[in-house]
Amino acid sequence: MKTEIYKLSAAELSSLYEEKSLSPIEATSSIINRIKDVDKKINAYVFIDEESAMKQAKESEIRWKNGSQKSPIDGVPTAIKDLLYTKGWPTLRGSKTISPNKEWNDDAPVTARLKEAGSVIIGKTTTPEFGHRGTTQSPLTGVTRNPWNLERTSGGSSGGSSSSVAAGMGPLAIGTDGGGSVRIPCAYTGLFGIKPTFGKIPAWPLSPFGTIANVGPMTRTVKDGAMLFAQISRPDWRDWHADSSMDSN
């Protein structure tokens, strides 16, 4: 393959999976190796769960071989901002006040939708403390840097997600946006990202910012953004604001 695997878009990965010329295991291994190579300088991830990611990738590979893939993003490595619950993992929110030993028993709606779609969830990305900053630096993780220029910020508060995607540490990432926390980092790192209409992507627990804060996709291409949006915009019973009337496809 001429293009290095970690540089491929989600749409390209999905197409190669379908052709059986690339496997989710190969893609996930490439992304994990990329994280190990470059994230010490960038600091986009709070943590990765390599064992879990490879297990998810193996399960996805079986589905693609059997023609029973769950969605176009089945087997595609994905990162989640560390403000959003992921079952079995801590959600530290960039703060030293939260115990790293506290694992959550529930998935946020967006995490649940990603798992239902078969996405390979790699790990959690950095955020300023409780998301209350326009740059991504916190007492817990320090400074997250822009992969295009390590002396520059990647913006905030979803700067970990934007840096991970821009640096090839995964083609898909999830951010949250109240006053620009998806849009600013995407602008700073050359990505596609949107703050969706309130209620289009379900959220739980509800944000302290009320109707201002939304969950949004962060990707290198518009096509990838549309693929991701279609999966995470499915309704969830825990969010009574969520709109189930619109077609995401």
Where are the language model's segments positioned?
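Gly/Ser-rich catalytic/binding loops embedded in alpha/beta enzyme cores
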Residues: 2-178
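Conserved hydrophobic/aromatic beta-strand scaffold that supports enzyme active sites
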Residues: 54, 191-193, 217
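Broad gene-expression machinery/nucleic-acid interaction feature
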Residues: 75, 191, 214
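Short, solvent-exposed loop/turn segments at the edges of secondary structure
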Residues: 88, 156-159, 186-189, 196, ...
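Short acidic, glycine/serine/threonine-rich loops at helix termini
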Residues: 91, 132-136, 183-188, 206-207
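Short, conserved loop/turn and helix-capping segments at secondary-structure boundaries
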Residues: 100-105, 185-188, 219
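Glycine/threonine-rich beta-strand-loop-alpha-helix active-site module
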Residues: 178-204
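A short helix-breaking turn/cap at a secondary-structure junction
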Residues: 195-249
